[in-house]
Amino acid sequence: MGLCKCPKRKVTNLFCFEHRVNVCEHCLVANHAKCIVQSYLQWLQDSDYNPNCRLCNTLLSSKETARLVCYDLFHWSCLNDLATQQPPNTAPAGYRCPSCQGPVFPPNNLVSPVAATLREKLSTVNWARAGLGLPLIEVAEPVDDTMSHDETDYRDWSVVNSSSDNLSETPETTSQTGYTYNSVAPGAVQQSLNGNMSQDHAVTIRDTGSESVPFNAASSPRKVYDTRENARGQDAVIDFDDDKYRRRPTLNWLARILRNRSGSKSRPASSMQRFLVILIIGVLGFLTLILLMSKLGRASADNDPNLDPLLNPHIHVGKE
């Protein structure tokens, strides 16, 4: 175990054989991408290392490298060629490390910088995307333009020449086509926009020598927007300056609650709110009535002569 020299200062058991320092996985990906890195115990057992790729026996620093989760390092091109030679139906577990026979694909629950870098590199090739559960990349097949531009079939030229001669012999006749557009007058359109619903109008295209084809505006895909609803909505929310300082009635808030402001589209909770307000008002009115009746009853009892003990003949006060 050792302490990495990076600002993270993480405790790690990885050791770079080339620089002879302890490295964490963050430094391994960032600064030691082409170095031989294994555990510190392996360094203590044998400090010798091979700086060449074990697949092509060339220096690892000469090409792009790929580090597996077992920390074995290979040229990415060599590892890709080796995996491409496998059958297309090879299972993900069939791809093994050439050095330690460990898995090439990192486990799904492994979260580390080395595993993330390896997944990103494996996602660029189709054989690895299938093992990672990703959709395959569509490779465009090259189109072979082997047809020679000099090869021409001259067998049908006689037919073309004969047809061109027949066309030249026939007199050229042209006919002009007339178009007639019938629509509603501008005054009627203005009237329909002001108060009435927009009426259907028809467009008729007449061709000289052919029958007329009517087009009905009601069947056209254009939408007809009624701007009167928007105008009514704007009038309802307009707040004039004169109304800002007008004195509101005392029970205006109660009228707003009891009034259905949304018309037919009432909210589900509006009926419940009205019921609660009416219930509270009823309880307050009942309590007020009880309090008023109690005060009036006590006042009438104080002035009642029948309840005065001095006026009762059966009560003698101050007599033996």
Curated annotation (Swiss-Prot):
Residues assigned to the Cytoplasmic compartment are 1-274
Q: Which InterPro entries match?
A: ZFPL1, Znf_RING, Znf_RING/FYVE/PHD
The membrane spanning regions, by residue number, are 275-295
Highest taxon above the source species: Eukaryota
Q: Which residues lie on this side of the membrane: Lumenal?
A: 296-320
Map the zinc fingers (RING-type) to residue ranges.
53-101
Q: What is its main location?
A: Golgi
**Gene Ontology molecular-function annotations:** zinc ion binding
Q: Which GO terms describe its cellular component?
A: Golgi apparatus; membrane
Q: For this UniProt record, give its keywords in alphabetical order, as a comma-separated list.
A: ER-Golgi transport, Golgi apparatus, Membrane, Metal-binding, Transmembrane, Transmembrane helix, Transport, Zinc, Zinc-finger
B box-type Zn finger ranges: 1-43
Topological type in the membrane: Single-pass membrane protein
Q: According to its UniProt record, where is this protein located?
A: Golgi apparatus, cis-Golgi network membrane
Q: Which residues form the signal peptide?
A: none
Q: Which GO terms describe its biological process?
A: vesicle-mediated transport
Q: Which family does it belong to?
A: Belongs to the ZFPL1 family.
The task this protein performs is described as: Required for cis-Golgi integrity and efficient ER to Golgi transport.
Protein name (Swiss-Prot/TrEMBL): Zinc finger protein-like 1
What is the taxonomic lineage of the source species? Eukaryota, Metazoa, Chordata, Craniata, Vertebrata
